[in-house]
Regions:
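Auxiliary Fe-S-binding modules of radical SAM enzymes
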Residues: 1-36, 96, 102-103, 235, ...
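Conserved, mostly hydrophobic/aromatic
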Residues: 18, 42, 72, 112, ...
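Conserved short loop/turn motifs at secondary-structure junctions
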Residues: 26-30, 60-62, 114-118, 221-224, ...
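N-terminal pre-triad scaffold of radical SAM enzymes
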Residues: 37-82, 86-113
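A structural signal for short coil/turn segments at secondary-structure junctions
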Residues: 49, 105, 136, 212, ...
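Mobile, glycine- and charge-enriched loop segments
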Residues: 54, 58, 68, 75-78, ...
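Hydrophobic faces of well-ordered beta-strands that scaffold small-molecule active sites
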Residues: 54-60, 108-110, 141-145, 175-177, ...
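Conserved Radical SAM active-site core
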Residues: 79-232, 236
């Protein structure tokens, strides 16, 4: 164990000793000057929990509509409905895309999200899932964030539980963890418009977990949040997971600035630095140690090279191939990569690549 010689933060000592970190500890670590030491401790804990393996899933990202009533300032993807590039896919079109994912790309997971469409009933989502499952029963359908579920419930005048039950009966396997953004109310009110509150997101997720629907969890960082908001957000996720055991991984999502209202209005003028990004990954690992085992590095937003570095700062998962990812593409990010490229990126840093399923069961190792 590291000896406290006055240069090592007490919170790092606690982390090395396996103690659960507090809010105060997290804030201290978000301000820790020695980034290398912070990363080294996070990497040590990552190794204790996950060994040398870095996982990823073969995932096809499918956006069923870009029409959204929310118009969040952080988003470059949404359309109001009268634009030339506004679209809504039919269940049949979605099933056809699922065929491409399975037959041509070897995807084991469909990651399906979209905008808050004001005219789609619950039957649309049920039919979408059934259309996929009738043709490809073995693919995992990970669809509709807690924010979308909450919106659908409000729109269709159903309870959140009823919406979740009907979608599960239609074949829904899991939920993506988007829509969490940042939980701090004041910050959330600036970067989010027309979306559920933090409490509503957490309660929707809790209900999903109670019904046996697992999910990942996320946090959007690198906009106007403060270090203490990052810590508080992560700790709320930690507390929920202690109750439900429903999160498969935590995915810190780096904010992509281009083409957003936050950029146009000058609220955010530049993206976060690599140093800040690595700090968030490392602190996430330390705060969630022994609670949520997996920390995913979302290379689509972070970039492949920085993602490799983040795997030495507490990350143990690269999320997935992200075939046909549209939301970050709208914000100027290059999306989509092959299984071979991901394995090569992992091997370059002397780690062991492994393909997983949605629920973190390893299904293929690469020598």
């Amino acid at each position: 164990m590291l000896k406290n010689n006055g240069d090592i933060a007490p919170a790092l000592e606690k982390a090395m000793a396996g103690e659960e970190l507090t809010y105060h500890d997290g804030v201290q670590l978000m301000n820790e000057e020695n980034l290398f030491l912070l990363g080294a401790v996070a990497d040590k804990i990552r190794g204790n929990l996950n060994g040398n393996t870095v996982t990823f899933v073969s995932s096809y990202y499918l956006n069923y509509t870009n029409i959204c009533v929310a118009s969040c300032p952080l988003c470059a993807f949404y359309r109001k409905g009268n634009e030339a590039d506004a679209y809504t896919l039919t269940p049949e079109q979605i099933a056809a895309k699922a065929g491409i994912a399975v037959k041509q790309l070897g995807a084991t997971e469909l990651h399906i999200v979209g905008g808050f469409h004001p005219k789609l009933g619950l039957d649309y989502y049920e039919n979408m899932i059934r259309a996929i499952k009738s043709e490809y029963p073995n693919i995992t359908v990970k669809a509709l964030t807690p924010a979308e579920i909450f919106f659908i419930a409000r729109l269709t005048k159903n309870s959140v539980k009823e919406v979740l039950l009907r979608l599960k009966n239609a074949g829904l396997d899991a939920l993506p963890g988007g829509g969490a953004e940042i939980f701090d109310t004041e910050t959330r009110d600036i970067v989010v418009r027309g979306k559920c509150s933090a409490e509503e997101w957490l309660e929707t997720t809790r209900l999903a977990h109670e019904l046996g629907l697992k999910s990942n969890c996320t946090m959007l960082f690198g906009h106007i949040e403060k270090p203490e908001h990052v810590v508080a957000h992560i700790l709320k996720l930690r507390e929920l997971h202690k109750k439900t055991k429903g999160f498969t991984t935590f995915i810190p999502l780096k904010f992509s600035l281009d083409n957003t209202e936050l950029e146009r209005k000058g609220i955010v003028t530049r993206e976060s630095t690599p140093i800040y990004d690595l700090r968030v990954i490392a602190v996430s690992r330390l705060l969630l140690a022994n609670v949520i085992n997996n920390i995913s590095v979302y290379w689509v937003a972070m970039g492949k090279k920085l993602a490799q570095v983040a795997l030495a700062y507490g990350g143990n998962d690269m999320v997935g191939t992200a075939f046909s990812e549209e939301i970050f593409k709208a914000a100027g990010k290059n999306t989509g990569t092959s299984i071979q490229e991901l394995t090569n990126l992992i091997k370059e840093i002397k780690r062991d690549p492994a393909q997983r399923d949605t629920f973190f069961n390893v299904i293929r190792k690469f020598s």
